[in-house]
């Protein structure tokens, strides 16, 4: 699994011009799922998302607090393109997990993130 983590003051996901999910202060996380990812990868990436220190701690220390420390929101977006390979001028996604397998895997990831954090603070691209 790959997670691209971005600290945000607000973020949203729009589909056909309509906002389907949004957050205030927190993290926007793009999630890529590789063909051979397993449950242990989910636990690892959840731990990293929750504990990586990307916020000021309030005492003047930069990079001193995690999203869990601050009780901020998390917006997750499934992004299979994180596992692309550039072949000449063409993108190849053979390393990404196929859609029929990745959808339940992604839902399991969201369930684990909600279980380890505050469920109502975890949003996804379908909320």
Give each language-model segment a name.
Residues 98-104:
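A short acidic, glycine-rich active-site loop
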Residues 1-90, 104-127:
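N-terminal, polar/charged subdomain of small-to-medium soluble alpha/beta proteins
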